[in-house]
A protein has these predicted regions:
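Extracellular loop and loop/strand-boundary signature of outer-membrane beta-barrel proteins
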Residues: 73-81, 116-124, 166-173, 231-235, ...
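Outer-envelope beta-barrel architecture signal
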Residues: 56-62, 99-107, 144-152, 192-200, ...
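Gram-negative (and chloroplast) outer-membrane scaffold detector with strong preference
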Residues: 101-162, 173-192
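Residues on the lipid-exposed face of transmembrane beta-strands in outer-membrane beta-barrel proteins
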Residues: 88-98, 132-138, 152, 181-187, ...
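Outer-membrane beta-barrel transmembrane domain signature
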Residues: 168-255
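Transmembrane beta-strands of outer-membrane beta-barrel pores
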Residues: 66-74, 109-117, 154-162, 187-189, ...
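Short glycine/proline- and aromatic-enriched beta-strand/turn motifs that initiate or cap beta-hairpins
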Residues: 22-106, 292
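Residues that define the transmembrane beta-barrel architecture of outer-membrane proteins
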Residues: 60, 82-88, 124-132, 146, ...
Length: 294
C-alpha cells in the first residue's frame, strides 16, 4: 500500500513539473496576491492563488494521510518498534493586522495515531501524539513566481505510548512546549493554464520545556508518593533534536484545489537517562480553501 502511495505521489509531482515547464507565462496569475479579488466568501475558484496575503482572507487546509512510523522509548522497551502511522493535519494562514502586508499569522495542528510492533513480534505499541503550533512569518516576493518567508512558532505537544506487553509501567506520557524556527518557500506556476503551486515548510525546535520521568522512576512514585523532582527538563537541539518538513503541491481540479503532501516528522529526546524517538513519514491528500471576510 505504501508503495502505491509513493508511486502516485511521484507521478503527480512529475505531472505538475511538466505542466509548469510547458507554460511559463502566468497571465492568469496575479503578480502580487494583493491584486486578488476580495469580494468572495469562498475563493477556491480558478481566479485565485494559494496565497494568504489577501486582506481579510484566511487560508484553510485539511490533509489526511498514512505512512510509516519508527518508535523507540527506553522507558517501555529497549527495542525499536515499526508500524503504520495515520495523520490528520490542519493548516491555517492569514495576513496579520500589522507589518504593512509583509507579516502572516500561521497555525498548524496535527494528530498522529500509530500501531507498531517489536522486531520479535511479541509486543505492540499503541501511540498517539497531538501538536498545535502558531506564530508569524515575514514574507518576501523576490519574483512573480516565488514567495519566501521566515519566522517563529510556539508549539505545544502531548501524547502517550502504550506497550501491550508490559505489566508494570505499561504506558509513557508526554507533554512539552517549545519555541521553533520556521521557514517556507512557495513557487507559483501554471497547471494547464490555471494557477497552482508547490510549497515546502521546515520547522525546528530551538528551546523549550518537556515532561519526562527519570530512569527507573515510576508514575506511582511521581503522582502517589510525590517524588516529582527532576521531571521537567529544559530542551534544546542538543538533547531534543526535533524538526518537521511539510511539502505539498496544490492543483486546481474543476472548482476545487486538491492538495498532495508529504510530511517528515522527526522527534527525538534524551532526557533523564531515557531515550525516545518517533520518526514518521506520511503521504497525504486533502484540499485547500480560502475564505474572505466581507
Amino acid at each position: 500500500m505504501l508503495t502505491r502511495i509513493v508511486y502516485t505521489w511521484l507521478c503527480a509531482l512529475a505531472i505538475t513539473m511538466l505542466a509548469g515547464a510547458q507554460s511559463r507565462a502566468l497571465a492568469a496569475v496575479p503578480v502580487h496576491p494583493h491584486n486578488a479579488p476580495t469580494n468572495r466568501c469562498d475563493t477556491s475558484t480558478t481566479s485565485t492563488l494559494h496565497t494568504p496575503d489577501v486582506p481579510h482572507a484566511t487560508e484553510r487546509q485539511w490533509l489526511w494521510g498514512a505512512g510509516s512510523a519508527s518508535l523507540l522509548d527506553t522507558y517501555l522497551s529497549p527495542l525499536t518498534y515499526h508500524g503504520t502511522d495515520l495523520i490528520v493535519l490542519n493548516r491555517t494562514e492569514r495576513l496579520a493586522h500589522w507589518g504593512r502586508g509583509h507579516v502572516t499569522v500561521a497555525g498548524l495542528y496535527s494528530v498522529h495515531g500509530a500501531y507498531a510492533q517489536s522486531p520479535t513480534d511479541d509486543g505492540k505499541y499503541l501511540d498517539a501524539e497531538f501538536t498545535a503550533s502558531g506564530g508569524w512569518h515575514y514574507n518576501w516576493h523576490p519574483t512573480r513566481h516565488w514567495r519566501l518567508a521566515a519566522g517563529g512558532l510556539l508549539e505545544g505537544s502531548g501524547g502517550f505510548t502504550y506497550n501491550t506487553r508490559n505489566g508494570n509501567n505499561p504506558a509513557q506520557g508526554r507533554l512539552g512546549l517549545a519555541l521553533c524556527a520556521s521557514g517556507l518557500a512557495e513557487y507559483h506556476f501554471a497547471f494547464f493554464k490555471r494557477p497552482a503551486l508547490a510549497r515546502v515548510q521546515v520547522d525546528a525546535q530551538m528551546m523549550g520545556v518537556q515532561f519526562a520521568p527519570e530512569y527507573g522512576q515510576s508514575y506511582y512514585e511521581i503522582f502517589s508518593l510525590g517524588h516529582s523532582s527532576g521531571i521537567i527538563h529544559f530542551t534544546h537541539p542538543g538533547n531534543c533534536p526535533t524538526a518537521r518538513l511539510l511539502s505539498e503541491v496544490v492543483l486546481p481540479v474543476k472548482r476545487a484545489r486538491i492538495t498532495l503532501g508529504y510530511l517528515a516528522d522527526v522527534r527525538q529526546s534524551k532526557l533523564g537517562g531515557l531515550k525516545r524517538h518517533a520518526w514518521r513519514h506520511t503521504f497525504m491528500i486533502g484540499y485547500t480553501r480560502k475564505l474572505v471576510r466581507l
